[in-house]
């Protein structure tokens, strides 16, 4: 058992603050304090524990009165220089030159939050200082160019050219408004709260953003960015007294308390539901039929009622999210929508419960509402499935106790959950960190009719509802673009010759401003660590290769809080290209169809009662020593408490060996759902999808990934769904034969993350699992993939592009070195950032260099296409002229080390172990790479120009983007085709 060290505040010495409350936050092994700064009125919550991954944020309540996106533009622009740190982009300087474990800023419908995290004390203090100066003393009052660059501006490079609009936030929101799910979410929020801040789009509506003036934008900052409207949060193992003294002396003591009217207002309940319908744009190739979204939305109490909120998280599972959940099943059985989504969202003062039917038809709206309400009435009368409720509670409780938030520091997630109550009650930051007792209470209420009463009161008898539909319209984006062109042409026509000349001059001036680097003396003001502050040792690989009951096992022997992270990895390296997409289907089938002993709904409940989740993944591990050699694995991952291991293994064998792939109706439902979810991911992650596709033209690894999770998988799924009746028998036979071939002892590798006790338990309990697993045949020779350069342009109903270029440097005779890790930082946050984002207006730009030689450059929500590709082609010249001084090199090195040293939770440490084993990389090689990073000189970067030239010479290009923009540049592609 671990002991938790907590440093107590010296409150007597902190005379600038008054203590509002202190609490033992035993659920998260911490002590919580709520303070108020006496002079400024700032609110501060502290969570003190022994977590070295320290977190700070400052947030502001930022309600809006229109959809110009002013809080979003401020979020971008305050990080573009300040009094103490006048460089043009301190945010990027920190990304490149700090050991941050998190660094970002986020705009919500009612708040704006600026969080940072770091494990290094000195670095953490630097990050705090830069962020505090940014929000309180930004350069936005001195330089209107910042507003124009990040928000919006008219652009006219030549007096005879048409006027256009550009700006990072403007283009980001054009991308956001291209997604039907994004459109629906906005309309739902607006529909339920028409008299509050939520009736507007805080991120900005692209049609409205250009109405925002520079003065209105500054007024918003003046009004809301005052300490008395702020929420300051500190978390982790640090000297809290020192941080509070710093806050007071450097910032808060300079302000006097004022009144800021920012209270988030409650929406008065409706007397009857409202019905709203809006259009969304689809590509000309897409069908109008089965393409509407229908939604049923209800406002549920307030976020200050933690038991109600957690009860609705459980109801979300029991009614809607779980496989076979009654609301979802009733709609699917009635043929309304092919994918049922929705759920419970408590990110606003009044949370929302939604049921959404995707791939539906507008004429079914009345039937949709009727089925939901009839089903709910029946549930209230007959009672909910008790096991579903208990499984829902167990699932939420497991997640809270485990506190595994992937790459996000848990202190950040705790801090954001503080805001779920604190923003609406200044005295209540810790409400959602004290919930284990609530879970206990909810378990006790399962048999009392409590959950059925909630359904009656909040879903059936509650008239605060909206029925929102969004309907497909072909060419809507093109129509809106044409209207904008006409509006801009009329605007230009209204200008005098002098005004046109001034606009050309302003455009030129902004470009000059963007191209001018920050003065050296300003850059020197950004605090930075030194090379010698970097730890020289690479993170150790803490695994051992052992035999568990005769099965090769990679055991990562670390403390895991009594949880087995068990990964059963079956080799699929010999599965053919034709068969691989069917593994993508199998992944969605296992655990979601009936088995010998359970129907699929009961199986889901059993999984959530006995484990922290069981899921399938398909991964490929490229061998770092042999080109085009790899290990492909079908992975069944589980999280099982030590005391539940026997039950967990029983469920794993039930899923792998006893799934009955015979239910045609259920199989079709699963196919339709995969198709729907893939559509969403192809659109929302267009940058990574297009990069993967570009690499698939030459890379076996990327070709594999595309077949099991990219555009190639989508095409197979769409074909199967469309011709299901004639293909269903073939599909069921194929899935069964693949399962029989793969799930055998001779293909199995185990990855276990747990301590010695956990390993011994597995050794003891695993023989029973092995008795049902046939020996089978060992995998055959790995498949040789047929890669073919296609250079595709995919047409989408988007307003922006995702532009990807790729190649392989190993095939051109170059090798992987630590310098490539630094190059990724330099390109992503210098060359590409300045050219693609700052000047080009794209929301994002990235690059990547894999050990197997695959390399890519990609853009995200990019208004451009051809010019972005030309920017990629300029990289070699940029590198040949690269001449960083020692400070700049150190900065790039720190940013690289920051990425290499991201703190890992137990599950991630286990994945790192097995990945190193399968990719054939040793600790010595990791150490050599780290040395190459820490000792890098400018010459090492300059020398990469030839490597990049070789990558670009392979000319692998893939773009996903707006129909008219891709068509306009069709000569760049070998093929232009519809994405869907």
State where each predicted segment sits.
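His/Glu-based metal-binding/catalytic segments typifying zinc-dependent metallopeptidases
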Residues: 48-50, 57, 170, 174-178, ...
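M16 family metallopeptidases and their MPP-like homologs
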Residues: 53-63, 89-137, 144-155, 182-207, ...
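Hydrophobic, small-residue-rich alpha-helical packing segments that form membrane-like cores
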Residues: 158-227, 233-251, 255-282, 290
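Extended, domain-scale alpha-helical bundle/helix-rich regions
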Residues: 447-486
């Amino acid at each position: 058992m671990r002991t938790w060290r907590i440093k107590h505040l010296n409150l007597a010495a902190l005379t600038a603050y008054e203590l509002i409350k202190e609490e033992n936050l035993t659920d998260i092994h911490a002590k919580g304090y709520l303070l108020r700064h006496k002079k400024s009125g700032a609110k501060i919550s502290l969570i003190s524990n022994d977590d070295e991954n320290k977190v700070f944020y400052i947030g502001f309540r930022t309600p809006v009165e229109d959809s110009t996106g002013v809080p979003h533009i401020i979020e971008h622009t305050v990080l573009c220089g300040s009094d103490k740190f006048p460089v043009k982009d301190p945010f990027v300087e920190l990304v490149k030159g700090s050991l941050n474990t998190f660094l970002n800023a986020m705009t919500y419908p009612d708040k704006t939050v600026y969080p940072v995290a770091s494990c290094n004390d000195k670095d953490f203090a630097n990050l705090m200082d830069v962020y505090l100066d940014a929000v309180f003393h930004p350069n936005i009052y001195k330089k209107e160019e910042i507003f124009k660059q990040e928000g919006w501006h008219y652009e006219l490079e030549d007096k005879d050219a048409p006027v256009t609009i550009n700006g990072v936030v403007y283009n980001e929101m054009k991308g956001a408004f291209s997604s039907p799910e994004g459109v629906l979410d906005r309309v739902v929020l607006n529909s339920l709260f028409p008299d509050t801040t939520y009736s507007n789009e805080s991120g900005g509506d692209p049609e409205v953003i250009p109405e925002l003036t520079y003065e209105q934008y500054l007024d918003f900052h003046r009004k809301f960015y005052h300490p008395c409207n702020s929420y300051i949060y500190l978390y982790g193992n640090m000297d809290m007294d020192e941080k509070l003294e710093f806050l007071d002396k450097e910032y808060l003591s300079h302000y006097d308390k004022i009144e800021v009217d920012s209270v988030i207002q409650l929406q008065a309940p409706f007397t009857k539901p409202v019905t709203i319908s809006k259009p969304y744009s689809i590509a000309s190739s897409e069908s109008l039929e089965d393409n509407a979204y229908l939604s049923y939305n209800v406002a549920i109490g307030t976020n200050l009622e933690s038991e109600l909120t957690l009860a609705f998280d459980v109801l979300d599972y029991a009614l809607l999210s779980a496989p076979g959940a009654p609301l979802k099943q009733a709609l699917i059985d009635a043929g309304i929508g092919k994918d049922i989504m929705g759920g419970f969202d408590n990110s606003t003062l009044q949370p929302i419960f939604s049921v959404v039917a995707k791939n539906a038809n507008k004429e079914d709206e009345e039937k949709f509402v009727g089925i939901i309400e009839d089903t709910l009435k029946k549930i209230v009368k007959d009672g909910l499935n008790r096991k579903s409720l208990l499984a829902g509670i167990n699932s939420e409780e497991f997640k809270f106790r485990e506190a595994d938030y992937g790459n996000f520091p848990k202190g950040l997630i705790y801090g954001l959950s503080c805001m779920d109550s604190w923003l609406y009650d200044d005295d209540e930051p810790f409400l959602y960190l004290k919930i284990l007792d609530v879970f206990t209470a909810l378990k006790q209420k399962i048999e009392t009719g409590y959950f059925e009463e909630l359904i009656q009161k909040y879903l059936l008898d509650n008239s605060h509802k909206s029925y929102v539909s969004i309907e497909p319209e072909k060419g809507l984006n093109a129509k809106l673009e044409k209207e904008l062109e006409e509006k801009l042409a009329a605007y230009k026509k209204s200008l005098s010759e002098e005004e046109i000349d001034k606009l050309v001059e302003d455009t030129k001036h902004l470009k000059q401003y963007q191209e001018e680097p920050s003065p050296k003396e300003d850059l020197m003001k950004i605090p930075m660590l030194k090379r010698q502050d970097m730890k020289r040792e690479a993170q150790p690989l803490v695994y051992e290769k052992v035999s568990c009951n005769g099965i090769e096992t990679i055991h990562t022997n670390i403390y895991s809080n009594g949880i087995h992270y068990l990964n059963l990895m079956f080799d699929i390296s010999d599965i053919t290209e034709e068969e691989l997409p069917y593994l993508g289907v199998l992944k969605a089938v296992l655990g979601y169809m009936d088995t010998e002993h359970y129907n699929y709904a009961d199986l889901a409940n059993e999984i959530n009662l006995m484990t922290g989740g069981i899921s399938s993944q398909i991964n490929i591990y490229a061998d770092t020593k042999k080109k085009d050699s790899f290990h492909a694995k079908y992975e069944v991952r589980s999280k099982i408490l030590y005391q539940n291991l026997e039950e967990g293994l029983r469920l794993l064998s039930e899923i792998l060996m006893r799934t009955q792939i015979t239910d045609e109706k259920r199989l079709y439902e699963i196919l339709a759902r995969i198709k729907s979810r893939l559509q969403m991911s192809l659109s929302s992650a267009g940058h990574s999808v297009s990069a993967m596709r570009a690499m698939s033209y030459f890379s076996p690894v990327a070709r594999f990934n595309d077949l099991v999770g990219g555009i190639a998988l989508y095409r197979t799924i769409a074909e199967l769904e469309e011709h299901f009746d004639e293909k269903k028998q073939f599909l069921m036979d194929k899935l069964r034969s693949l399962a029989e071939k793969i799930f055998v002892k001779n293909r199995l590798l185990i990855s276990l993350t747990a301590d010695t006790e956990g390993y011994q338990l597995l050794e003891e309990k695993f023989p029973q699992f092995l008795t049902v697993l046939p020996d089978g045949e060992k995998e055959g020779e790995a498949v040789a993939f047929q890669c073919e350069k296609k250079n595709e342009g995919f047409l989408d109903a988007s307003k922006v592009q995702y532009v990807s270029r790729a190649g392989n440097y190993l095939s051109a005779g170059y090798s992987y070195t630590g310098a490539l890790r630094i190059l990724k930082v330099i390109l992503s946050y210098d060359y590409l950032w300045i050219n693609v984002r700052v000047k080009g207006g794209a929301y994002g730009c990235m690059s990547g260099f894999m050990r197997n030689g695959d390399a890519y450059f990609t853009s995200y929500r990019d208004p451009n296409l051809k010019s972005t590709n030309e920017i990629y082609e300029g990289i070699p010249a940029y590198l040949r002229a690269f001449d960083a001084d020692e400070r700049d090199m150190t900065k790039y090195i720190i940013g690289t080390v920051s990425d290499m040293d991201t703190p890992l939770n137990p599950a991630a440490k286990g994945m790192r172990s097995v990945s190193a084993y399968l990719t054939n990389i040793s600790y010595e090689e990791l150490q050599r790479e780290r040395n190459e990073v820490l000792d890098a000189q400018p010459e090492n970067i300059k020398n990469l120009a030839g490597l990049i030239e070789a990558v670009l010479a392979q000319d692998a290009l893939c773009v996903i983007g707006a129909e008219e923009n891709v068509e306009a540049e069709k000569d760049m592609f070998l093929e232009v085709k519809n994405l869907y």
